Structures are given as C-alpha cells and as structure tokens.
Amino acid sequence: MSQSSDPSPRLVESPLLLQSSDLFCNLDIPQLERIRHPDSLTPSPNSVPPSPMLPIPVSVPNGDWESREELRLRELEEARARAAQMEKTMRWWSDCTANWREKWSKVRAERNKAREEGAQLRSRLEILSKELGALKRERQEAATETEQLRKELERLQGKARVLVSNDHDIEEPVRDVEIEKLTKNKDSDLDNSVRLECWEIQNGGPSRSPRPRNWEDVSPSEDDTTKITALKLRLDESQKVLLKEREDKMLLNKTIEKMEAEISQWKMKCEELNKSRQEAVKQLTLLRERHQDELGRISEDLQDELGVRSSMDKKLAELRAEMEGLQAENAEEWGRRERLETEKLNLERENKKLRLQIQDLEEILTRKRRQSASALDTDLKSIQAELFEKNKELSDLRHSHSKLKKQYHERSSEFSHANRRVEQLESEVKKLRLRVEELKKELGQAEDELDEAQNQIRKLQRTLDEQTELNENLQVQLEHVQSRLRRQQNPPLFGKLRASRFSNDDAVDLGSDPDEDDLQIQVP
C-alpha cells in the first residue's frame, strides 16, 4: 500500500506538473524545467512571478485584445468551476472517511468488550471446575464416613440385642413370651430413637413426636454409650457436610444457568456483529463504485484541463510571436538600435553562460540523485538560490533597460496595459495549477485512506471469526461440564444407609414419616 505522502502515478505522469511559466520563457531556456524532480509536487523556483517585460511601442487594434481577453476570462471561469467541483468531491471524501472511522471505532470497542468477557468466562469456568473437583472429593469422603458410621451402628445394635437376650435367659421361663415381646419393643424403640435423633440433627430442632428413652431400660455398658455419643457427633458432622454440599451444588446450578444465559447473549451479539459486518461490506462496495465513478470524472476533467492548457500555451506562443514581429518592425524606427543590440548580445552571452551552468548543474544533480536524496534537496536549494540571484540580476538589467526607453512610454502605454493583463491572467493560472496539484495530493491521500480502511475491515473480520470460534469452544466446554455433572448423579446416600441399616419391619414403620425425604441428597 502506498504511503499518503507519495503521489499516485497518474498525478506524477500528468503534464500539468511538468509545465510552468518562468522568467526564462522569453529567453528560450527549456532545460530549466528538467531541474524539478518528477516525483516532487512542491512548486519550483520557476514559479516566481516574472519581471515586467520590456515595453515596446506597438500599435494593436483594440478589438482583437478585447476578444482575446474575453476568451481568457471564460477559460479562467471554467477552470475555477472545475476547481470548485474538485473541492466538493474532496469534502465528500473527507466526510465519508470520518463516518467510516467512527464505525471502525465502534466495532473495535465491541471487539475489545467481547475479548474481555470471553476472558472472564474462561476464568469463571476454571474456578467452577476447581470447585467441582473439591466437591467431588468432599462427597467421596462423606460417603466413606457414612459407610463407617453404618457399620458401627450395626455392630452396636448387635451388642445391644445380645445383652437383651442374656437378660431374658436369667428370668423365669414362664414369662418368656412377654420378655420376647418386650425385647422386640425395646429393639424397635432403640432403632426408632436413633433414627429420630438423626432426623433431629438434620432438621436442626426436635422431632414431632417425643423421643423415647429406652436406653436406660436396655442398660448398655459405658463403652457402648461413649461410642454411641461419638457416633452421634460424627453423624452431626456428616449431616452438616452433606447440607453444605447440597447448598454448593445449588449455587453451581445457578452459576451454570447464568453462564448459559450469558452465552445466549453472546450468540446474539455475534449475530449482530455479523449483520453489521455484512452491512459494512455492502457500503464498501458502494463506496468503491462511487470512487471509480469519481476517478473517471476527475480523469475526464484533467484531460479537459490539459486541452485548455495546451490551447492557452498555443495562444501565448502566438502572442509571443506577434510581439517578436512587432519588435522587428519597430526596431527600424529607433536610432539607438545598435546600443540596444550590444546590450542584447551581452544578455545573450550571459544567458548562454547560464544555460551551460544549468546543464552542468543538471549533470551534478543526476549524479547526486543517485547517491542520496538528502544531498539532492540541498543542491536544489542552492541552485534555486543561484537562479533567484540571476533572476534578480536580469530584473535589474531590464530595469536599467526600461530607464533608457522612457521616451517610448507614450506610444506603448496600451501595449504595456495588455501585457499587465496577460501577467495577471498567468498568475491566476498558476494559482489554479497549484490548487489542482493540492487537490491531486488530497485525492491520493483519500485513496490511501480507503486502502487502509479495507485492510482494517479485513483485520476486524478475522478477529470476529476468531471470537466466534472462541465462543463456540466455550459453549462446548460448558456442555461437557454439564454432561459430567449429569453422569456423576448417584442415588441418595441416606436411602442406601436406611435400606442396609434397618430391617423390613422398621422400614414399614418409617414409611409414613414425612421427614424422611429431607435426608436424601438432591443432585440435579
């Protein structure tokens, strides 16, 4: 992509940049135009306004001059209209570039927001995965503890039953039937009391029915009572751990739902970004078409201006030829022709010397141009200074020459007035040329900005594609986590404990209790 400072090749190759009127146009020095670098668009020292020409008494009919002035004025008006049109097009291009910059800034801000939110989602996913691993480990530890507690309870129940059976053997055989009934009732009451205590620990308060105190009737040993109290404490701790695990799982479910909602919102944002990208592509195509149309119009305008320029050059050449003819005709009328011719010869010699110097300078410039661009600029500045000094000397010589011809001012007043008008027109033409060159520079800058805009849109499209891929990967990871959570769902732990710990008769007694469902761990 070309830089904004480099002119386009179309502008460099235009002959308008290589043509300029200077002080040496009347002295036949065409080599001076070659001093300017073809890539530079800065005005050359040749654009210095020329010194007034030698007043020559000429008798010219007024009708021809008026018609020529009218033609020149028309051409100047046309050139001004073209310059105004080019200014309008450049303003339109500047407005378009400003609008596109605003849109690109919005798209960049949205892209940065999407990146930040994606990073936040990743960090939250990592935290949730770590929490899930910790909860799994705690769950396994709780399961092992519950298994140990269940075994301890079964062992203690066996001991209690053995003690009860020993007491019954010591009593009379007549009351065997009653004793068996009492032992069964005591065992059932003991089991019920243990279960009720577990439910009370879980619910955090007393049970609905009063707790039976049949432990005193059984009269267990002190070791058994201490073990039972220790088991109760361990059961309390396990219940608390299970409740905490349940709360953590509920929080995890809520966070997963929030993340799913956020992912759906991100999907909607991605769709909106895709729509905006499509609209931007459409607008870019329209802008390209308009740009091509404008370039075609500008090229046509440049061709028209080249034609106008060539016609003006032809007319100027004709005027110069007429002036030379008038000089030749009027030279015979004056007696001081020889003196003027000698001065002219001196001037021509000086001009020849200047031509030779210019040729030498051109050769030096070509050598230095190959070596370095910086040296070229310095040499050009020195050459421009020398040329400016030579122009000053020539203007001084012409001024002295004009002093010698004061007696011819009366007859050449009309001719000098016409010359001043021509000079004014030429200065206006130069201003218009400079304006056209500036407009060409701005046009090149607009083309470069358009290229930069296209590259930025491609980059934004790549980043949007990468962001969509990242969002899809995050969604896949979330689905994987949800599937793992579903796979890890196990049957309630306390349901297994109840089935293994109690007999079928006890299960029938406890089936109607509404507090039994609170002991089950609900895993989503």
Swiss-Prot record:
Keywords: Coiled coil. The gene is ccdc102a. Residues 68-167, 242-490 form a coiled coil. Residues 36-63, 201-223, 504-524 are annotated as: Disordered. InterPro entries: Myosin_tail. The keyword Coiled coil applies. It comes from the Eukaryota. GO terms for cellular component: myosin complex. SUPFAM superfamilies: Myosin rod fragments, Tropomyosin. The lineage of its organism: Eukaryota, Metazoa, Chordata, Craniata, Vertebrata. This is Coiled-coil domain-containing protein 102A. Residues 506-524 have a biased composition (Acidic residues). Residues 46-55 have a biased composition (Pro residues).
